[in-house]
A protein has these predicted regions:
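Conserved G1/Walker A P-loop phosphate-binding module
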Residues: 1-78, 86-89
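Conserved C-terminal guanine-recognition region of P-loop GTPase G domains, centered on the G4
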Residues: 52-60, 79-144, 172-176, 199-215, ...
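G-domain G4 guanine-recognition motif of GTPases
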Residues: 67, 98-101, 122-136, 143-151, ...
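An anion/phosphate-binding loop that grips the pyrophosphate of nucleotide cofactors and donors
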Residues: 91, 236, 341
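Short helix-loop-beta junction
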Residues: 205-215, 310-325
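Redox- and metal-dependent alpha/beta enzyme cores, enriched for Fe-S-associated oxidoreductases
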Residues: 266-321, 329-333, 338
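C-terminal functional extensions of proteins
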Residues: 288, 293, 311, 319, ...
Length: 405
């Protein structure tokens, strides 16, 4: 997958923060080499977070996020500040842009404390260096720049690159479960909710990971699954299905063949599968009047039969036999207070970076609200979670302990 096609969730997210008129947007435009944000002498020109996916050398694929000033005022200003601070949830590296002619302000000091509290690596870019004297020595994560004079911008980018955490061993979606020449069957329903002319991102990424493992990927609809399996001389190593077809696919795939879902694979990839497994047990305890939050990390046009807003609520009501209520969020929106919910059911999070997914998990756990995901919940409600977790022995044991406990 080329840099230009790198999914947003796999890119380093760099957030630029600061007070109004510190020259934050001007610095962003210099760093990106294009007019990403409108600049003006009028305070509060940036009214909403603006983000752009691009390649930023020497880092590579990134998402640059320019945020409103954190000192905005009035009712509208307070909302802008809230949105700016929400960006921290997905920020891998923070850049605080200051006006070097006035020194660090109390609000900027508070922001630095937030970076430290959330363990976000940060850089301080003292802008307007052409209007003040530059100290001979400074901390290694600070630099004086001038957006107006295009000064020290390359050095700022190098400083940001050094703030990137050392690359961890590459995580794999499914390749670590496979050997070269293994056959994997992917079951992809084509219904009214499926996008025209393409596969969705989780399916694309899974196919790519299978190919990189030297394995063989076969893609079929559930309606052709039986014929696909019969055409093979040997049973496939693994069958991966869209979660909504779990019930049908479970009946068609021989019990000696391992079966899981795209959603479960992505939960493991994002590091939240264990919590999702434990959260699924809450489905057994839902009561009349409980509210379940169903949250998706992307936005798409809702159609009849949508899995999040129609199928999941119907399955949950049928499984529990209770009058359960539902709330829905999509994209960047996630409630600041989830304590009113009995359960959060989240999508696989393919469009979210790891930091944002971990924030949502931690946010729910701190309020003692269980969280599970689409694939785990659907498999549990269809009575096949035990089978769906068989490819992951340690996690399978965690579910067995929960189910029998």
């Amino acid at each position: 997958m080329g840099l230009n096609a790198q999914p947003s969730g796999e890119r380093v997210h760099i957030g630029f923060f600061g007070l109004r008129n510190a020259g934050k947007s001007s610095v962003v435009n210099r760093v990106t080499g294009q007019t990403m944000s409108i600049v003006s002498d009028v305070k509060g020109t940036t009214t909403d977070p603006v983000q752009k996916a691009m390649e930023l050398l020497p880092i590579g694929p990134v998402v640059i996020i320019d945020t409103p000033g954190i000192d905005d005022e009035g009712t509208l200003g307070e909302e802008r500040v809230r949105r700016a601070l929400r960006v921290l949830e997905k920020t891998d590296i923070a850049v605080l842009v200051t006006d070097s002619t006035r020194g660090l302000q109390p609000a900027e000091q508070e922001l630095l404390e937030l970076f430290r509290k959330r363990e976000i690596p940060f850089v301080i870019a003292h802008n307007k260096a052409d209007l003040t004297s530059v100290p001979a020595a400074m901390p290694e994560n600070e630099i004086y720049v001038s957006a107006a004079a295009d000064s020290n911008i390359r050095e700022l980018k190098e400083l940001i690159a050094r703030a990137v955490k050392p690359t961890e061993p590459e995580k794999r979606l499914v390749a670590d479960l496979l050997a070269p020449n293994d056959t994997v069957v992917l079951v992809v329903p084509i219904d009214s909710a499926a996008p025209k002319g393409r596969l969705i991102l989780p399916q694309q990424q899974t196919i790519r990971d299978i190919l990189e493992a030297g394995a063989i990927s076969l893609v079929t609809r559930e309606t052709e699954l039986t014929r696909t399996l019969e055409s093979l001389r040997e049973p496939p190593r693994l069958v991966i299905t869209d979660s909504q077809a779990f019930g049908i696919v479970d009946k068609l795939v021989p019990k000696n063949v391992q079966l899981t879902s795209f959603s479960i694979l992505f939960a493991r990839y994002k590091g939240n599968l264990r919590q999702a497994i434990l959260g699924a047990a809450q489905l057994n305890s839902l009561q009349d009047g409980d509210t379940v939050l169903i949250s998706e990390g992307c936005t798409h046009h809702r159609q009849c039969g949508d899995i999040g807003t129609e199928k999941l609520p119907n399955w949950i009501r049928r499984f529990t036999g209770k009058d359960v209520q539902f709330s829905f969020t999509a994209g960047n929106e996630f409630p600041e207070d989830v304590s009113k919910y009995a359960l959060v059911v989240h999508c696989g999070g393919c469009m979210l970076n790891e930091r944002e997914m971990q924030y949502r998990l931690r946010h729910s756990a701190e309020r003692n609200v269980p969280m599970t995901n689409y694939g785990i919940a659907i498999a549990h409600m269809h009575g096949i979670l035990d089978r769906a977790l068989a490819p992951f022995p340690d996690l399978h044991q965690a579910w067995s302990s929960t189910a029998n406990g």
